[in-house]
């Protein structure tokens, strides 16, 4: 398929509260993923964005649960698991 992807309209969300939860492993890659998520959330005019780090990818689901219990509206989960690594 040649051409460009269609542009999707983004609804401003100034009241939204979003947590970006990232593994502390492979920060060189995770930091780029976090930056991309932050750019998208900024474009959507999200009111509150907090970045939280956890030791590894295994802890991300529990941290997401805590974020929702703390009244976050959404969670962006960022992690990288490589075969053979913790």
What do the PLM-derived regions correspond to, one by one?
Residues 24, 54-58, 79-84:
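Acidic, glycine-rich active-site loops and adjacent beta-strand->loop/helix elements
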Residues 50-66:
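N-terminal beta-loop-helix "entrance" segment that forms/cooperates
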Residues 63-86:
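Glycine-rich phosphate-binding loop
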Residues 8-55:
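Glycine-rich phosphate/diphosphate-binding loop of Rossmann-like nucleotide-binding domains
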Residues 2:
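Glycine/small-residue-rich loop that forms an oxyanion/phosphate-binding "nest" at active or ligand-binding sites
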Residues 30-31, 59-61, 85-86:
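Short glycine/serine/threonine-rich phosphate/pyrophosphate-binding segments
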């Amino acid at each position: 398929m040649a051409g460009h992807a269609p542009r999707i309209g983004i609804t401003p969300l100034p009241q939204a509260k979003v947590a970006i939860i990232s593994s502390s492993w492979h920060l060189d890659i995770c930091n780029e993923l976090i930056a991309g998520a932050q750019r998208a959330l900024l474009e959507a005019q999200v009111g509150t964005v907090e970045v939280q780090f956890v030791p590894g990818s295994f802890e991300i689901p529990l941290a997401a649960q805590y974020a929702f219990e703390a009244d976050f509206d959404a969670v962006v989960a960022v992690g990288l698991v490589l075969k053979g690594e913790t």
